[in-house]
């Protein structure tokens, strides 16, 4: 019996998780993003959403709750949450203008 295909939302969540681990495995620890891995992920995968962030080093520091110079998945998830909130705000403004 074939598994049912994932919904669009399920695929999106899977992509968020897979992207983290794809970049986390490039150097050092395989379960966290180094500074270089974080910068590469942002540059390649989030160039439009984080184009106005200023310093990526400062952004990483703000996400790195335990200040170990690595982003664990839960710290990376904070970034995803921040981006989702910004997208929601923009969509909300568009709706209000109509």
Curated annotation (Swiss-Prot):
Ca(2+) 2 binds at residues 64, 66, 68, 70, 75. It is found in: Cytoplasm; Secreted. InterPro entries: EF-hand-dom_pair, S100_Ca-bd_sub. GO terms for cellular component: cytoplasm; cytosol; extracellular region; extracellular space; nucleolus; nucleoplasm; nucleus; perinuclear region of cytoplasm. SUPFAM superfamilies: EF-hand. It holds the Pfam family S_100. Keywords: Calcium, Copper, Cytoplasm, Lipid-binding, Metal-binding, Phosphoprotein, Protein transport, Repeat, Secreted, Transport. The modification Phosphoserine is found at residue 32. Ca(2+) 1 binds at residues 32, 37. Coiled coil: none annotated. Expressed in heart and skeletal muscle. Plays a role in the export of proteins that lack a signal peptide and are secreted by an alternative pathway. Binds two calcium ions per subunit. Binds one copper ion. Binding of one copper ion does not interfere with calcium binding. Required for the copper-dependent stress-induced export of IL1A and FGF1. The calcium-free protein binds to lipid vesicles containing phosphatidylserine, but not to vesicles containing phosphatidylcholine. This is Protein S100-A13. The gene is S100A13.
